[in-house]
């Protein structure tokens, strides 16, 4: 550890190099990470943001070695609250998270241009939502486990409209 000490505790600004190669640079309070800091993982990942009593809690940015990036709220070290995740392939999710899982309201845009906006549960569209395909096909209605389910309306680019029940993504 290189930094400020108060009564044999890390307190203030400092840098700690872990045995596994990880490194933390930032604020300390009562010998734990507390305040603003940057954590460099030996894997190549990086977190920059708020810490509360040694845990990523508050606003932060987590950048993965592969280029994936999350910007938003953290709670107890997990992506929880409002946030945006951008995958290295160009896909983007903006919305609510619970423990690193898309849950609540959100919008996901695939790299191919397809887009879903609505309810999420267990990392999948689940509840009410709108799916707009890159070819212009649009579905508005129920979803379950990532597929069209229940009552809904589908409109094709040619103007064909189907209103009725869907089961596992089929009319």
Q: Residue spans of the language-model regions?
A:
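Conserved anchor residues at repeat-unit boundaries in beta-strand-based tandem repeats, strongest
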Residues: 1-11, 23-34, 46-57, 69-80, ...
């Amino acid at each position: 550890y290189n930094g400020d000490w108060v009564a044999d505790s890390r307190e203030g600004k400092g840098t700690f190099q872990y045995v596994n190669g990880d490194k933390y640079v930032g604020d300390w309070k009562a010998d734990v990470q507390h305040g603003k800091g940057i954590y460099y993982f030996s894997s190549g990942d990086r977190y920059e943001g708020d810490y509360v009593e040694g845990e990523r809690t508050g606003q932060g940015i987590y950048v993965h070695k592969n280029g994936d990036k999350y910007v938003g709220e953290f709670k107890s070290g997990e992506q929880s609250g409002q946030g945006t995740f951008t995958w290295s392939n160009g896909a983007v999710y903006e919305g609510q998270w619970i423990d690193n899982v898309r849950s609540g309201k959100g919008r996901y845009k695939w790299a191919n241009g397809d887009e879903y906006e609505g309810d999420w549960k267990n990392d999948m569209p689940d509840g009410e939502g709108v799916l707009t395909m890159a070819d212009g096909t649009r579905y508005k209605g129920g979803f379950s486990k990532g597929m069209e389910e229940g009552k809904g309306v589908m409109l094709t680019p040619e103007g064909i409209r189907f209103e009725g029940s869907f089961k596992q993504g089929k009319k």
